[in-house]
Swiss-Prot record:
The keyword Transferase does not apply. Component of the Mediator complex. Component of the Mediator complex, a coactivator involved in the regulated transcription of nearly all RNA polymerase II-dependent genes. Mediator functions as a bridge to convey information from gene-specific regulatory proteins to the basal RNA polymerase II transcription machinery. Mediator is recruited to promoters by direct interactions with regulatory proteins and serves as a scaffold for the assembly of a functional preinitiation complex with RNA polymerase II and the general transcription factors. It is found in: Nucleus. Residues 7-30 have a biased composition (Low complexity). Residues 1-38 are annotated as: Disordered. This is Putative mediator of RNA polymerase II transcription subunit 31.
Length: 176
């Protein structure tokens, strides 16, 4: 390799990185990495930042699981909703409805279910498989039809607006 490259082969046949971090490959015992630089950039500046990120990810995953009626049925049948601490946790998770957090949610119906889980009656109904099946069916129909209908409704509204604009342009201004 040329000497202008940051990676060079030394006299022993090992590959060296001329930057601050030295990476050495040994043929005998695999790869070994020798770090000479203490200024390596870590993804987190401190343990608290890493803990906050992990909490964010875990809460996001849990919130999104709430969009699954079968998972809600599992929680109900395993008596999670009878635990006051768990119910309080669901109340705490309401902050995910704020726009700065909601933008990370892929399944927005999870926020709707989070609202419903604040109701004792809804939590009780989730114990019954018929209720869970009904919720699942309604969710499926919403995905199947509402999205498509919503797009056709938007297209119709757009066409009406365009027609109104064209009519306004064609009509000459009236003078008194």
């Amino acid at each position: 390799m040329s000497s202008s490259s940051p990676i060079n082969e030394n006299d022993n046949g090992n590959i060296e990185n001329n930057n601050e971090t030295n990476i050495t490959e040994n043929g005998d015992n695999g790869e070994s990495i020798d770090k000479k630089d203490d200024n390596i950039v870590l993804p987190y500046e401190n343990d608290e930042e890493e803990a906050n990120y992990l909490r964010f990810i875990m809460e996001l995953e849990f919130i999104q699981c709430l969009s699954n009626p079968r998972y809600l049925n599992y929680l109900a049948q395993n008596r999670y909703f009878q635990d006051k601490a768990f119910v309080n946790y669901l109340v705490y998770l309401q902050y995910w409805k704020k726009p700065e957090y909601a933008k990370f949610i892929v399944y927005p119906q999870s926020l709707y279910f989070l609202d419903l889980l604040q109701e004792e009656r809804f939590r009780q109904e989730l114990n019954h498989s018929q209720s869970t099946d009904f919720i699942h069916e309604q969710q499926f129909y919403h995905w199947q039809y509402y999205r498509n209908n919503r797009m056709s409704i938007k297209e119709q509204e757009l066409q009406q607006q365009q027609q109104q604009q064209q009519q306004q342009q064609v009509q000459p201004p009236t003078t008194v």
